[in-house]
């Protein structure tokens, strides 16, 4: 019986030479993948509605901690579909549990021709970690490669050390999850052998991803 081999799409290449990074660009959003934007809350404020509409944004992932809810808000719930996640920018925060929900939200957006903005407060740590995880799992690449890909488009990203550790562990988690999904009942009785590069140690269980934590989905969408 052959081992399960996973296949992934290729990462999109840059259409043109990347723009030189300047400090003010950290206050704007950047397109990381076609239809997927990463940025700070300042890119999603009420004053930026015309920019969001010009870019074709239809979905927004708003990442905030409870104590930030007074100033980080889903400002356009009548225009865009929102996923609001309660995540602290803290090294001990279990961010892996939010990867599945955010990936499903992003996939649902892109598959229907929409465009999504992922933002936290500064667009540097929490939101960047979610985008990196999405790219890792979607394209089957390692943390370092996904980090570099995102940083080439938003230079200021800097996930905290705890998030980096979890992202490094996540490679083994998503590969195991996808492999199990593809295995036949007979294969499930055999030892797991994953054919997609080095996976590292699987210290976290797949249950980490299934714990959704405290999150809220706002789905008010015109039309």
From Swiss-Prot:
The lineage of its organism: Eukaryota, Metazoa, Chordata, Craniata, Vertebrata. One of its GO terms (cellular component) is cytoplasm. Catalytically inactive phosphatase. GO terms for molecular function: F-box domain binding. InterPro entries: Dual-sp_phosphatase_cat-dom, Prot-tyrosine_phosphatase-like, STYX-Interacting_Phosphatase, Tyr_Pase_dom, TYR_PHOSPHATASE_DUAL_dom. Pfam families: DSPc. GO terms for biological process: negative regulation of SCF-dependent proteasomal ubiquitin-dependent catabolic process; regulation of ERK1 and ERK2 cascade. It comes from Xenopus laevis (African clawed frog). This is Serine/threonine/tyrosine-interacting protein B.
